Each structure stands twice: as C-alpha cells, then as structure tokens.
Amino acid sequence: MCGITGWVDFKKQLVQEKQTMDRMTDTLSKRGPDDSNVWGEHHVLFGHKRLAVVDIEGGRQPMACTYKGDTYTIIYNGELYNTEDLRKELRARGHQFERTSDTEVLLHSYIEWQEDCVDHLNGIFAFAVWDEKRNLLFAARDRLGVKPFFYTKEGSSFLFGSEIKAILAHPDIKARVDRTGLSEIFGLGPSRTPGTGIFKGIKEIRPAHALTFSKDGLNIWRYWNVESEKHTDSFDDTVANVRSLFQDAVTRQLVSDVPVCTFLSGGLDSSAITAIAAGHFEKEGKAPLHTYSIDYEENDKYFQASAFQPNDDGPWIEKMTEAFGTTHHKCVISQKDLVDHLEEAVLVKDLPGMADVDSSLLWFCREIKKDFVVSLSGECADEIFGGYPWFHTADVESGFPWMRSTEERIKLLSDSWQKKLNLKEYVNAKYEETLAETPLLDGETGVDKARRQLFYLNMLWFMTNLLDRKDRMSMGASLEVRVPFADHRLVEYVWNIPWEMKMHDNREKGILRKALEGILPDDILYRKKSPYPKTHHPEYTKGVSEWLKTIRSQKDSVLHTLLDRKQLDQLLETEGSSFKVPWFGQLMKGPQLIAHLAQIHTWFEAYRIDIDER
C-alpha cells in the first residue's frame, strides 16, 4: 500500500512548484515509509510514498511507460489480486513487461482499455494516470471503497490525495467547515455521506466511481454497482458457489513478497479467513500462520456480557489456534495507551472517529507491524450476509439502523446551532437519497424491497465507514490490511441470494456458516456474532472524562460554541449515561461518546478549522 497525491493545473507551469508537492507528499509518510518520490511536467505534479509489498525493487512510483510513442505515468495505492491473469491477457495483446509489480500491470491496463480498465480489475485501489497524449488525468477508486481518494477543485487547480491532510498542505487550501460539514459531524458522524470530505470544498471519489480532469473540466461517473437479478441457483449450488468464491478471494489475497498474517477474534469471519490461510500456508510449506488478537487490560475482571457481546473472545481464539496450529499473538492494550492514542487517531484519520474503537486499532496495528507488513481481516461479512442485529428485527424500521440517536444528538447542540443545522431534515434527506438509489428487482415491494434497501444502506454507509477506519488506522501504522469479504465477485453473488437462504437454519449469516462446514470446527462455526471488543474498565472512563473536563475548562474550545453547556455538564457528571442511546453503532455510548466529543475538540484545534456559517 502507499500514499498518493497530485496537482493538475492547465493554466500554470507546475514544475517550479515541486517544493509544494514535497510538502503534500511528506504528509503521507506513514502510508509509505519505504520510498518517496515526486514527478512532474508542465501542468501536472505527482507525489508518492511507498509501502513495499510486491516487487520490492521494481515497483517504484510514480511509474512511467512509453507505448507506441505515447507516455503514461501512474501513481497507485492498492493491490491487484488478478495481476497474473491481466499480465497474460495483456501480453497476448502485445504488451511487454519489465517488472513483476502490479503497478506496471495496472498502467498497461489503462493503456490498453483507457477508462474501461477498471472493469478488468480485481483488487483494492485508488490510482491516477497522467495521459500525455490526451492531456488529461484519469483517476479511479475500487468498487467497495477500501482505498481512499480525496480531491478538491480550487480555481483552475485540481488537487488530490490519499488523505485529506495532503490537500490541506497546499498553501491555497484552508481548513474550513460549513453548515453541511457540521451536519455531517453531528448528524451522521462518525460515518459520512458517500463522496463528502467534511472540510468545505473537499470531496472523495465515491466507491466504484472514476473521473477525468482535462481542459474541458471535471467529469465523474459510476463504473460499477450491484445488480438485482432473480437468484436461480439451488441451495446446494449456492453453498458451493459461496464457498468457492470466498476461498478464491482469500487465496488470491495471500500473495505477497513480505510476511503475511491474519487478525483472529475467534468469530466466524476472521476464523474463516484464518482457516483457509492456514491451509494454504501448510500446502505451500510456509506454516505456521501467525495470528493476532487484541484484548484490554483487566478485561477478564471488568468484562460485561450483553446481548451484543455475550462472551469474551479468549476461549474461541484458543480453539482456533489449536485446530489450525497457528502461532498466536495476544496483544493487551493498557487503559493509558487506549486514552493516549485517541488524539493521534484523529490526526491519522483527519476527522473525529469512533473513539477507542479507532485508538485501540491504531495501537494494535502498530503491534502487528513490529513483525508483519500485511494482514488479512474479516470486515464486510456482516454487511453482505446480514449479520447485524438490525437485519433481524421483526420489522425493518425507517432511518439509519445504526444511528437511532438523532433526537438526542440535536439536544446536545446549543440552541443557536440546533436552528442553524436542522439535523433531522438533513439526516432524513441522506437516508431517502440512498433508498432512491437502491437497485431493486422489477416489481419488488414490501418487506423484500425494504430489506434490499437495508442491505444497500449497509454497503454504502456502514461498511465504507468501517473500511475507512481500517485503512486509516492500519496505514497510520504502515501496515497493509486486506479484506477478502470485500471481493466484488462475492459481493455481487451474495447480493441476490434470497433472505431465506442467507438465513439458513434460521441463523444470522446461515448460508456462510453452511458454506464453511468442514472448514471450521462446529463450535466456531455456530458461535453467536460478537462485535469488535470494547473496554469496560473504569480507568478508561476516568481518563476520557478528565480529558473532556480539561477541554471544558478552556474558554476558547469550540465545544462551548457548538454544544449546550447543561447537556455537556450532565454528560460528564453521569459518565456518559445521560445520553440514552448509542451515538453510533451498537456500543458507542457512555465513555465512548465522551471521548468522541473530545476528539471533535482536538480536530478543530489541530487543524485550525474555521467555521463558515454562511
């Protein structure tokens, strides 16, 4: 993985602006500590930071290729999982290769198919190509949004980067947030509307979208979406296809020239990846596979079972390591480290995040990076197979199911900002826009229509939020994380499996469990879903409460402008329990909400953000 950034301006000679590009590139050092390079000519500048994973010596970027007299230059963040398939096809079409990297294959894919190259790619990617012949920039982002690509148009300049901080390093870009940005933070955060960058004027290429920037202007289009079709496969064929697609996705994503490990929580998703990876390692003579889990200091003492988290992960992890002979590493984070990483998590993400869910992941990825460069993780299974509790309620309610807190959020704002933002209307509009975009089957109505819309909401919003978190926290540790459940072939197939099949044996993710029979031990196979672990330690609550109290004592804190003083005081007095529902997701409440508000203060202060009230 890497960090990319660039600047295109057809009215300026940019070669003399390389110092600015150096600054923009340097902001992405954590994404690519192994190499750094800047390239430019006339109206374009590219910057690249590299984390070397495949073709260590030959994969330097920006990478240029002259083909039939025309020169093309690429910067690319990601990983292709069909590199050799593409290389073979392109060779048959007359292309020659000097290296073994997927970057060169991607560049030749663009040369051969131009904008249609994205239709041929299996992988996670965000990349930009300067096409000298056509005098334009082409850029694209992977189908599910695993890799980020932010951009802005400022005057005649088009600026972009893997992270917002690269764009903000340009002298013409100021850190501002307007009413729309604040509506995102307080109405929808820590998720955000697909395509928005929160900062005024900064946007993100949506998943499965591409763009060109030329003298004719900016053109953006969607190149992929799930398509709703009648599922005609038998149950047995469906099980076999799910198994085959998933096994192929995992196996393809194990390709690397550097050490690979897996996350392992003992849950269904990470265990499935671990089982297949361990078998592959055994077959290839690379065993044992190394696995990693995270736990919290004194969690055995303070763990609180709930409907969402009925039991601790520990015993399940032990079952997996024994069954597959993995070398397991249990990483235990202290409450101090958990609190201390909260501020840095904001700086890594460029936005307020999911409190300790982010900070623990950042710390965890740094522990893994001490010995590994690449890890596989189980994100996306719940979104595509229907694993979350809100898929299983008696009736599919309206509104974002992971966020039932709009009324409570509104009360937290000061009177003046309640009037300025109109959060309820804003949130509902975003919800309705997504429903209207959902690709439905002809004639689909009632519960079937509502359920398909629910899956689409999860894919576009909740899944991209978790992928966003995983990218930023892992790359903040210079660790590449791959997500086999986000393989677009698997997503396309599962999209049309009827709910009754997905719920085989009346179990959440029942079809996936059936597909994994014979691969996983039965007790792991039928373990109830449990989310990412959280701390219940009173020291964490104390730590974040003291942090927010210190912020409250600062007269110039933006929280005094935005929040209702009585609500803030009550939140601190009750250690977060005055806020009656989770701020976001299943477990983000109490001390997590306190930490999130402190992160909002940190964000405004660290980025010196001005509020544009117009």
Curated annotation (Swiss-Prot):
What are the site positions for Important for beta-aspartyl-AMP intermediate formation?
Answer: E379
Q: What is this protein called?
A: Asparagine synthetase [glutamine-hydrolyzing] 3
Cross-referenced InterPro entries: Asn_synth_AEB, Asn_synthase, ASN_synthetase/amidase, AsnB_N, GATase_2_dom, Ntn_hydrolases_N, Rossmann-like_a/b/a_fold
PANTHER family hit by this protein: ASPARAGINE SYNTHETASE (PTHR43284:SF1), ASPARAGINE SYNTHETASE (GLUTAMINE-HYDROLYZING) (PTHR43284)
Homology family: Belongs to the asparagine synthetase family.
Q: Which organism is it from?
A: Bacillus subtilis (strain 168)
What EC number is given for this enzyme?
6.3.5.4
Q: Where does ATP bind?
A: S377, G378
An MF annotation (GO) of this entry:
asparagine synthase (glutamine-hydrolyzing) activity
Report the protein's function. Answer: Asparagine synthetase involved in sporulation.
Q: Where is the Glutamine amidotransferase type-2 domain?
A: 2-216
Pathway connected to this protein: Amino-acid biosynthesis; L-asparagine biosynthesis; L-asparagine from L-aspartate (L-Gln route): step 1/1
- Ligase as a keyword of this entry, yes or no, is yes
Q: Which gene encodes it?
A: asnO
Q: By its UniProt entry, which PROSITE patterns does this protein fall under?
A: GATASE_TYPE_2
Q: Name one Pfam family in it.
A: Asn_synthase
Q: Which reaction does it catalyse?
A: L-aspartate + L-glutamine + ATP + H2O = L-asparagine + L-glutamate + AMP + diphosphate + H(+)
Q: Where does L-glutamine bind?
A: R50, L51, A52, V53, V54, N77, G78, E79, D102
What Gene3D superfamilies would the database entry show? Glutamine Phosphoribosylpyrophosphate, subunit 1, domain 1, HUPs
Active-site residue numbers: C2
> Per its UniProt entry, which superkingdom is the organism in?
Bacteria
Query: Which keywords belong to this entry?
Result: Amino-acid biosynthesis, Asparagine biosynthesis, ATP-binding, Glutamine amidotransferase, Ligase, Nucleotide-binding, Sporulation
Question: Biological process GO annotation list?
Answer: L-asparagine biosynthetic process; sporulation resulting in formation of a cellular spore
